Regions:
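N-terminal secretory signal peptides
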Residues: 8-60, 122
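C-terminal motif of bacterial Sec signal peptides marking the signal peptidase cleavage site
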Residues: 3-6
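Helix-rich interaction surfaces within compact, conserved domain-sized segments
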Residues: 66-125
């Protein structure tokens, strides 16, 4: 008696992150030097060296950090360094575990436009 089993396999974590990064990147503007920072509402891991940080419900920043940043992919929580209530590229860091990951680039994300696109996609399914 032979047993045939099949399991549905969806995209793995890296593929999901790559897809999410593509979406965030499409709605991200040009690089900026810094952004105002008072509190972090949420964050989304988008790859080994990429993440989106939400500072308000409809305000997010796409960050790229420089290696080494080995703990980011496995982080449960992160923090950001800041100076005078601003986070600056090439000066501040994403703090995760024992890593201090230098922020290489900051891009503002048009969260409202991203949400509109998602609603349109869900409406057409």
């Amino acid at each position: 008696v032979g047993v045939l089993s099949s399991c549905a396999s969806g995209p793995g974590p890296r593929e999901r992150m790559a897809t999410q990064y593509e979406r965030y990147s499409r709605f991200a503007g040009d690089a900026v030097a810094s952004f105002p920072f008072f509190t972090m509402q949420n964050w989304v891991l988008l790859g080994q060296y990429r993440l989106a940080v939400y500072t308000k419900v409809n305000e997010a920043w796409l960050l790229e950090v420089s290696p080494p940043c080995s703990d980011l992919e496995f982080a449960q929580a992160i923090a950001l360094s800041s100076s005078v209530s601003r986070v600056s590229a090439k000066f501040d860091h994403v703090l995760v575990g024992r890593d201090r990951c230098p922020i290489k680039e900051i891009r503002p994300v048009d969260v409202r436009a991203m949400k509109r696109e998602r609603k349109l996609e869900q409406g057409s399914e």
